[in-house]
Amino acid sequence: MVMAPIPQPWHQWPFLILFFLVLFSCESNLPCRNGVEATQRVFLYPQSPKVSSIVSKGYRTGYHFQPPKNWINDPNGPMYYNGIYHEFYQYNPNGSVWGNIVWGHSVSTDLINWIRLEPAIEGNTPSDINGCWTGSATILTGDQPVIIYTGADTEKRQVQNIVLPKNRSDPYLREWTKPKNNPLIEPVGPGLNSNQFRDPTTGWIGPDGLWRIAVGAELNGYSAALLYKSKDFMQWTRVDHPLYSSNASNMWECPDFFAVLPGKNNGLDLSAAIPNGAKHVLKMSLDSCDKYMIGVYDLKHDMFVPDTVLDDRRLWLRIDYGNYYASKSFFDSKKGRRIIWGWTNETDSTSDDVAKGWAGIHAIPRTIWLDGDGKRLLQWPIEEVESLRRNEVSHQGLELKKGDLFEIKGTDTLQADVEIDFELTSIDAADPFDPSWLLDTEKHCREADASVHGGLGPFGLVVLASDNMDEHTTVHFRVYKSEQKYMVLLCSDLRRSSLRPGLYTPAYGGFFEYDLEKEKKISLRTLIDRSAVESFGGGGRACIMARVYPAAVVDGATHMYAFNNGSSTVKVSQLKAWSMTRAQVNVRKG
């Protein structure tokens, strides 16, 4: 399809002046809260009265996971069993705010199109009467699936319970039963806070043949992943030391523990022998962010040992630098990969959520593996999402000089998948890097936004832009030189994403190290889904999930551009964009 030619800077100056002036005038926002709150709350939001709103339909996503209506938060117990993918989730069947939580349940054969089922777990026994919260699935020896989850008992203590499928011959595993010996694990022991003891992990087998799980906890005022052992997955004994603990924080939610191989995107099954050379990852949810450490699992001492110990948790690695929390991974035995899911909350108001009748989505499932140098996880949307692509638009060899803005036409800009390779013509133009920026990347993205000229960057995408550009979201790179290496900053700036008041509109950002002398180019992939903008920079080295609510989405008219506002010219060696058709997400009930 024929596209408009690349505009020359003098053709675009009135337009660009408006674009960069409105960027420059944005107010700053508080760092790293992401509009996300703790997932296991012991209070209920008051039910707001229904109000009329223009947001009732326009912002509902077309291919991200969400129930037909009401509130959703953490993904729970994802697994692949007998040809079916299962996704459980924290769900309020009675409203679009947090409360009345049960385990929703949906099934799929491709992780994209989903059939909804009746809730799998409800709080109706003494060990979960005050809440049935996050947990994990494990496939035991003999092909037996089980789920361990946190319940709030009659005393409102957080305890760990188990459920078993009532009929394993049912391909959808619709019904689950609770053994009478629940709870399996209680919050006993010195220094353990009974109200901060939750979210058990998937089980793994140690060198002694015993099963293990970790549970997030506050121990003596600090964060810990407590370690438990069992022969039969029913009788559990707490190990006398945590899997890992840190005095840099006071509570870890939703811990995850899994093995990865450097440079290989095949996943590892924790219930099988782990090959030599594998690394282990300990992921935790805190500060409204999902963070992780890479290290080794010391089998002799039954402990996780990180490669690098950082006392400042602001320097811990991030799964995602945007609105992404409570992630859960699982081994997909069908394709031999590890997949991770995360929850993305709304960042509009509670009254908006009530008016919409729904709140919360899950990010696109991502394949996750370890970079070849063993220093960082890489993430990429699962290949199945590509089945939704339609109407491909392609460009090669485009040149973007300082101030150039190139409109990408021929795709549905409300639901799109865009992949761009930016080729750098002069990496020597990179500005010097200041390590202090790592302590607050959002602040740096605000101060060095798309209106601020740099040596290399900003360059990237403008998405969900209104006709006159008074609403737009930028996803862009900046390149810096740090001693003998290059640091790349990926920003997703939401501060001009909407004219609507009362929204949380930060400038998200994250750095990653990149060998530009070898690669010479940086890739960007962005999935646009009405109110979701999900970006992957540098082949998945930095990921940013964002929620936006432009009025232009409701009007059904938005634009998308590639741009460069750096002093050095960048080339778009490859640009591909597709319209994304709507997935069948929980439309049908099974």
From Swiss-Prot:
Positions annotated as active site in the UniProt record: D74
The residues that hold substrate are W71, I72, N73, D74, Q90, W98, W133, T134, R198, D199, E253, D287
> Which tissues does it occur in?
Expressed in leaves. Expressed at moderate levels in roots and flowers, and weakly in seeds.
Q: Which cysteines are disulphide-bonded?
A: C445-C491
Record's keyword annotation contains Plastid: no
Q: Which UniProt keywords apply?
A: Apoplast, Cell wall, Disulfide bond, Glycoprotein, Glycosidase, Hydrolase, Secreted, Signal
What turns on this gene? Answer: By rice blast fungus (M.grisea) 12 hours after infection.
Q: Which GO terms describe its biological process?
A: carbohydrate metabolic process
Enzyme type, top EC level: hydrolase
MF GO annotations: beta-fructofuranosidase activity
**In the record, which residues are listed under signal peptide?**
1-28
Enzyme Commission (EC) number: 3.2.1.26
* Family, per entry: Belongs to the glycosyl hydrolase 32 family.
What is this protein's record name? Beta-fructofuranosidase, insoluble isoenzyme 4
